[in-house]
Amino acid sequence: MSATHPTRLGTRTKESNACASQGLVRKPPWANEGEGFELHFWRKICRNCNVVKKSMTVLLSNEEDRKVGRLFEDTKYTTLIAKLKSDGIPMYKRNVMILTNPVAAKKNVSINTVTYEWAPPVQNQALARQYMQMLPKEKQPVAGSEGAQYRKKQLAKQLPAHDQDPSKCHELSPKEVKEMEQFVKKYKSEALGVGDVKFPSEMNAQGDKVHNCGNRHAPAAVASKDKSAESKKTQYSCYCCKHTTNEGEPAIYAERAGYDKLWHPACFICSTCGELLVDMIYFWKNGKLYCGRHYCDSEKPRCAGCDELIFSNEYTQAENQNWHLKHFCCFDCDHILAGKIYVMVTDKPVCKPCYVKNHAVVCQGCHNAIDPEVQRVTYNNFSWHASTECFLCSCCSKCLIGQKFMPVEGMVFCSVECKRMMS
């Protein structure tokens, strides 16, 4: 792949900018009524408020389940999905756990229940319940709670649909579609996994069973002695925090990492963003756990404009980020900026004409917009052209460049006398 480098002007400004004037207007189910939501046709943001879709997204449950179902399709985790008879689309079979208050229900008193929108897919409900209690309270996916909202946001952030489904991407070429399909197939076979919740003692017992099967001719007394000594020495430490796990507490295992490693439930996190791996879905690479987004980021450049992975041979690098050539464009007019001069406005690239028209500061002297390539003097929220025609004493018109001055509400004075004369 090769990259081009456009030219940035160093002008800084605090003004906000409007969304691009183009775009398909379609209001998705997660947009609130009355907000004037308009979806930009490839930026995945609102054209009116510039809020990124991934931070606004609250997908419907069936949309979430379709996305995760597609992720698990053609993997060893097909037991976690079911295909609808109507369209054959794989759906994620989330394990929903409902707990009833153990206190005996009294007459005319409703039974108190707690519903977890997701729980580890284990048969032992006590194990699942213990796992949930080891998570931070604000991250427990109890229906209607902050934790449930956290899970939904992480589903959107960690597992973007456009990282696995070419149809969710913007105008991929046939070659790019094929390359993306191969990329997805590769990470499904080499990196994707789902954590297992187990008791460390249970895993150790399984290891002992395998060990004893391999030494079936050893004397029983010796085998018993060795097992006792090994049990006393066994300590289970978390692969993330290195602290030991307490006896009787569940841990998470990742098959890709090997069952000699385990994690506390709250430590099963992405090594890049530090967030809990949503629904224990992980990607394993070079001894580290990743969420889907950051695993893909470690393999492919991601466009800062559309948030999609870049499969084309050429792309642009600017502002320490990568961009599709067609997506590094003015945030106001959508004109491509590759090889052109631009100005960053609230972390968004804007072409010079749009900057002058929509965002440039106004000179207090001549009341014209200040060109981004022209030097200026700024004090608090006021600016002047750094010229002998504009940066003058508001009373006697003395040039103040390189001189001391007294600012007063958009005016500048060369002396106390001039200030008094204008007061």
UniProtKB/Swiss-Prot annotation:
Query: Could you tell me in which tissues this protein is expressed?
Result: Detected at the acrosome of round spermatids (at protein level). Isoform TES1 transcript is highly expressed in adult testis and detected at low levels in other tissues. Isoform TES2 transcript is highly expressed in testis, kidney and spleen; intermediate in thymus, submaxillary gland and lung; detected at low levels in other tissues.
Biased composition annotated in UniProt, kind: Basic and acidic residues: 160-169
Q: Name one GO biological process term.
A: negative regulation of cell population proliferation
Q: What does this protein do?
A: Scaffold protein that may play a role in cell adhesion, cell spreading and in the reorganization of the actin cytoskeleton. Plays a role in the regulation of cell proliferation. May act as a tumor suppressor.
Residue runs in coiled coils: none
* GN (gene name): Tes
| UniProt cross-references to Pfam families, sorted A to Z | LIM, PET
Q: Which PANTHER family match?
A: LIM DOMAIN-CONTAINING PROTEIN, TESTIN
**Which family does the similarity line name?**
Belongs to the prickle / espinas / testin family.
Its quaternary organisation is:
Interacts via LIM domain 1 with ZYX. Interacts (via LIM domain 3) with ENAH and VASP. Interacts with ALKBH4, talin, actin, alpha-actinin, GRIP1 and PXN. Interacts (via LIM domain 2) with ACTL7A (via N-terminus). Heterodimer with ACTL7A; the heterodimer interacts with ENAH to form a heterotrimer.
Q: Give GO terms: molecular function aspect only.
A: zinc ion binding
| Organism the protein comes from | Mus musculus (Mouse)
Descriptive protein name: Testin
